[in-house]
């Protein structure tokens, strides 16, 4: 009897061992198979050193609006543009998510949270946006949040960690949040003046009205028959405002760009290609401009355009022979010009114009609507295809129609979007699925450049300008 029992126990043990081994084998096989499957699309942390970083300044051979994300030959996405497009695909027909993002050093419940900001914060998290999910990201939660959000593209996280300064990181973070999740980002020192649902981007009747009352503006490649009524009626995918429109001869002494887009408040759908290009540019710039990037940058960038990646060659400094272009950046030598052209409104504006020029060049169905070209303010309306007539000089000098000839020539001869298209805006403008709001919308009460008061119908957000990042950065770098 004892022999039979011993044999039975041994048999059961053997079966248990066999089953356990088979189970472990199955789990390992599944894990390895799953890992191989994921590696076809997402590079691991060990692989991201091989990621190629295309320059955004030379994208003449690609249609940025219709980016294809599958490399059929290698079945792997080695290009950061491809990786971003695949990880965060863009759905132009989806609504803008009802989310509001803000960031600060500490959470709102922390005793060190500025008391003045509580009033501003309540406008974003209160009755003006009751149906919106509000998120305040504090400094100590940024890295864990990004590591989860951008796990498919770890090189982006690497670049974020390498940034020499919190101002650069704050700029980069807003683009990363909107690209991955969408919604509205607004600086902590901003106040929401009107309910979000009253914004032109949220108002379907306004969108329908602007389409009905304004003919699409032609450009060289345009084919009106290709414009789909369904596409036209969709909510914009990116909503931005004018920050600066200095119509003066000495504008370059005060501003980085003649038309500068505001980035303290941005509304977007996740995956928008402009944000993708911005993230690509900032990631590549960071890795190429800082000390000890931890990756073989020279093997990742396009050797034909090395200067595109170095922040020291941006804007005015490109032709400054006295500037040390080879000097790598650290937290002691980053100044206001670096921030402006690395993550700030300078590069933000450049990327937007580059994208618009690209889509006009490669697509024949881009919707261009500019009510500011169709009317002469109080003088009534005219067609955008004919020059302004019988308008006094003072009125014309403060109207977009002042630049009618330049705008028409740029669009119809070279598929080029001129900055003049966005000057003196009183009404929102549409370029494909990008809506550009007048300076009054996010900069009321500034008392210049045509900005109106907070009571104006087009005033939606007020910036309190509590920060002085450029002055602080210049002092940090030893500038006066």
UniProtKB/Swiss-Prot annotation:
Enzyme class per UniProt: transferase
| Gene3D superfamilies xrefs | 3.90.550.20
Q: Which reaction(s) are listed as its catalytic activity? A: Transfers an alpha-D-mannosyl residue from GDP-mannose into lipid-linked oligosaccharide, forming an alpha-(1->6)-D-mannosyl-D-mannose linkage
Motif DXD motif in this chain: where? 187-189
Q: Report how activity changes across the pH range.
A: Optimum pH is 7.5.
Query: Where is the protein situated, by its record's location annotation?
Result: Endoplasmic reticulum membrane; Golgi apparatus membrane
Which keywords describe this protein according to UniProt?
A: Endoplasmic reticulum, Glycoprotein, Glycosyltransferase, Golgi apparatus, Membrane, Signal-anchor, Transferase, Transmembrane, Transmembrane helix
What induces or represses its expression, per the UniProt entry?
Expression is regulated by SKN7, SLN1, and CDC4.
Task: Tell me the Gene Ontology biological-process terms attached to this UniProt entry.
Answer: protein N-linked glycosylation
Topology, Lumenal side: 31-480
Q: What are this entry's molecular-function GO terms?
A: alpha-1,6-mannosyltransferase activity; glycolipid 1,6-alpha-mannosyltransferase activity
Description of the deletion phenotype: Stops growing at the early stage of bud formation and rapidly loses viability at the non-permissive temperature. Exhibits a defect in the initiation of the mannose outer chain. Leads to accumulation of free forms of oligosaccharides (fOSs).
Function of the molecule: Mannosyltransferase involved in outer chain elongation of asparagine-linked oligosaccharides of the type Man(9)GlcNAc(2). Adds the first alpha-1,6-mannose to the Man(8)GlcNAc(2) and Man(9)GlcNAc(2), but not Man(5)GlcNAc(2), endoplasmic reticulum intermediates. Represents the first enzymatic event required for synthesis of outer chain mannose linkages on yeast secretory proteins. Also has the potential to transfer a second alpha-1,6-mannose to the Man(8)GlcNAc(2) core oligosaccharide.
What does the sequence similarity comment in the record state about its family?
Belongs to the glycosyltransferase 32 family.
- Further remarks about this protein from its record: Present with 9490 molecules/cell in log phase SD medium.
State what protein this is by name. Initiation-specific alpha-1,6-mannosyltransferase
């Amino acid at each position: 009897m004892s022999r039979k029992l011993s044999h039975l126990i041994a048999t059961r043990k053997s079966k248990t061992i066999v089953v356990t081994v088979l189970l472990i084998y199955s789990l390992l096989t599944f894990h390895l198979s799953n890992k191989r499957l994921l590696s076809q699309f997402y590079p691991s942390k060990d692989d991201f050193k091989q990621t190629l970083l295309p320059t955004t300044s030379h994208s003449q051979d690609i249609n940025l609006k219709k980016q294809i994300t599958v490399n059929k030959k290698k079945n792997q996405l080695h290009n950061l543009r491809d990786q971003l497009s695949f990880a965060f695909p863009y759905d132009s027909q989806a609504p803008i998510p009802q989310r509001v993002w803000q960031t600060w050093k500490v959470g709102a419940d922390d005793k060190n949270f500025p008391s003045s900001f509580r009033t501003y914060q309540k406008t974003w998290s209160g009755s003006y946006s009751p149906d919106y999910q509000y998120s305040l990201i504090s400094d100590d939660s940024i890295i864990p949040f990004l590591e989860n959000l951008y796990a498919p593209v770890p090189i982006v996280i690497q670049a974020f960690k390498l940034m020499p300064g919190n101002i650069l990181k704050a700029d980069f973070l807003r683009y990363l949040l909107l690209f991955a999740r969408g919604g509205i980002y607004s600086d902590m020192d901003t106040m929401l003046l009107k309910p979000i649902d009253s914004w032109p981007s949220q108002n379907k009747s306004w969108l329908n009205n602007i389409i009905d009352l304004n003919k699409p503006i032609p450009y060289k490649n345009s084919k009106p028959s290709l414009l789909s009524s369904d596409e036209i009626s969709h909510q914009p995918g990116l909503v931005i405002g004018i920050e600066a429109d200095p119509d003066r001869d000495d504008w370059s002494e005060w501003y980085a760009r003649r038309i500068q887009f505001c980035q303290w408040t941005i509304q977007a759908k996740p995956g928008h290609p402009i944000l993708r290009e911005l993230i690509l540019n900032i990631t590549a710039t960071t890795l190429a401009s800082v000390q000890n990037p931890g990756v073989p940058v020279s093997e990742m960038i396009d050797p034909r355009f090395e200067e595109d990646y170095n922040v020291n060659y941006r804007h005015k400094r490109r032709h400054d022979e006295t500037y040390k272009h080879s000097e790598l950046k650290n937290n002691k030598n980053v100044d206001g010009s670096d921030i402006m052209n690395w993550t700030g409104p300078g590069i933000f504006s450049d990327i937007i114009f580059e994208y618009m020029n690209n889509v006009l060049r490669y697509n024949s169905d881009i919707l261009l609507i500019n009510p500011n070209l169709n009317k002469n303010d109080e003088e009534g309306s005219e067609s955008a295809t004919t020059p302004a007539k019988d308008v006094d000089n003072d009125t014309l000098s403060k109207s977009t129609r002042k630049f009618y000839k330049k705008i028409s020539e740029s669009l119809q001869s070279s598929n080029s979007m001129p900055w003049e298209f966005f000057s003196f805006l009183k009404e929102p403008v549409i370029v494909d699925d990008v809506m550009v709001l007048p300076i009054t919308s996010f900069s009321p009460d500034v008392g210049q450049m045509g900005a109106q008061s907070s009571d104006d119908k087009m005033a939606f957000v007020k910036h309190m300008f509590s920060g002085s990042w450029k002055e602080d950065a210049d002092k940090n770098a030893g500038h006066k």
